[in-house]
Amino acid sequence: MGSTSSLYAAIDLGSNSFHMLVVREVAGSIQTLTRIKRKVRLAAGLNSENDLSNEAMERGWQCLRLFAERLQDIPPSQIRVVATATLRLAVNAGDFIAKAQEILGCPVQVISGEEEARLIYQGVAHTTGGADQRLVVDIGGASTELVTGTGAQTTSLFSLSMGCVTWLERYFADRNLGQENFDAAEKAAREVLRPVADELRYHGWKVCVGASGTVQALQEIMMAQGMDERITLEKLQQLKQRAIHCGRLEELEIDGLTLERALVFPSGLAILIAIFTELNIQCMTLAGGALREGLVYGMLHLAVEQDIRSRTLRNIQRRFMIDIDQAQRVAKVAANFFDQVENEWHLEAISRDLLISACQLHEIGLSVDFKQAPQHAAYLVRNLDLPGFTPAQKKLLATLLLNQTNPVDLSSLHQQNAVPPRVAEQLCRLLRLAIIFASRRRDDLVPEMTLQANHELLTLTLPQGWLTQHPLGKEIIAQENQWQSYVHWPLEVH
């Protein structure tokens, strides 16, 4: 294939898993085509002399033979293969890499811990929404990366020699999930963290983002158990108690924890508890991407956007030919409503952002068909890749779009976990009203309105005579009033 190919591949030879990401460049952003992950547990093959066992190397080569088949269609200049902590440590890494290069047909680069941390940060910066000033945490199999930064720039980079595989072998070797093993694992992790904690705290952060399998597992557990997606120390301690209650690693059962992740979950959990405690982290969310995404965006030389969510929404509006003027019109009305009730309802800024995002996408279902457009919209948003939005935020957007008109499905608003159920109901009410009053698709036909909230009662005041002059509008509002009353949302329109 010629070098005009739009395909790119990034391979990460990690200490616990080998990963391959294949993407296609589309109009300045990336479309994921393939993700392959295999548990190789390379770090478990290191002995006390840091010799990598033949069995571990063979597991690695076997995995690379699978990857090699997919790489044949991609120009070598558009492939990056990096190896991390275990192959930095292994004294016989050269033997493994020589054969790996032969299998893949392209160079394998062993990167330093700092370079790994930088790439992880770039992957997060390109794919994760939220505040600009962030702390990124990635717990790997044999190393843990901690990075602070603002926008695209890192301010401090650390790669520490502790990981979920090495801590498993060191502190849970007897497969016993007792308090003593957890205490020893946490104490050791805190000792590794202590020398770098001051510098990380000095640079500071507004948001903390986790980019590892441990954090992914926590997210899956919390989604399965209907909790909100924010990881807190309290939740980590609860999960530790649950693990201790299970007694042994082979008996570890937590709702939402897959068998594949269970083996290294307790060791990863102990490291994460130590990080939360030592750095006094209030809460953490899951990153949209990490090392592999950093490699891909690096090959593409794409600048980091200041607002990833806005880029995502623009791309989707273009792709599904959404009427952007109408989306903006609905967003403007919704923002105006939100600003009038936010104090009474104690709404947070993130809720405003998510409401505006729902407005930007509310007509996406029309790209399938007018009939059942809200259901089509919810399906598309639930299943599209939305960089900058967390899984729980995607679910909330889909739920809001499902309930943008017609009778309200209250249970769906209560099943999302991005915001409390009451907030989801409030955002839904504002979205529905904004869509109604922007429905004429002209700025000059949107009436001047005031919206007041008194507990759950909404009072909407329209210009004098508006309802008389707009009989269809009056009918639509009467129907909306009825639908809101069915779910005990009191609405008065004057």
UniProtKB/Swiss-Prot annotation:
It holds the Pfam family Ppx-GppA_III. The keyword Transmembrane helix does not apply. Its EC number is 3.6.1.40. Keywords: Hydrolase. It is an enzyme of class 3 (hydrolase). One of its GO terms (molecular function) is guanosine-5'-triphosphate,3'-diphosphate diphosphatase activity. Pathway: Purine metabolism; ppGpp biosynthesis; ppGpp from GTP: step 2/2. SUPFAM superfamilies: Actin-like ATPase domain (SSF53067), HD-domain/PDEase-like (SSF109604). GO terms for biological process: guanosine pentaphosphate catabolic process; guanosine tetraphosphate biosynthetic process; nucleobase-containing small molecule interconversion. CDD domains: ASKHA_NBD_EcGppA-like. It catalyses: guanosine 3'-diphosphate 5'-triphosphate + H2O = guanosine 3',5'-bis(diphosphate) + phosphate + H(+). PANTHER family: EXOPOLYPHOSPHATASE, RETROGRADE REGULATION PROTEIN 2. Belongs to the GppA/Ppx family. GppA subfamily. Catalyzes the conversion of pppGpp to ppGpp. Guanosine pentaphosphate (pppGpp) is a cytoplasmic signaling molecule which together with ppGpp controls the 'stringent response', an adaptive process that allows bacteria to respond to amino acid starvation, resulting in the coordinated regulation of numerous cellular activities. This is Guanosine-5'-triphosphate,3'-diphosphate pyrophosphatase. It comes from Shigella flexneri.
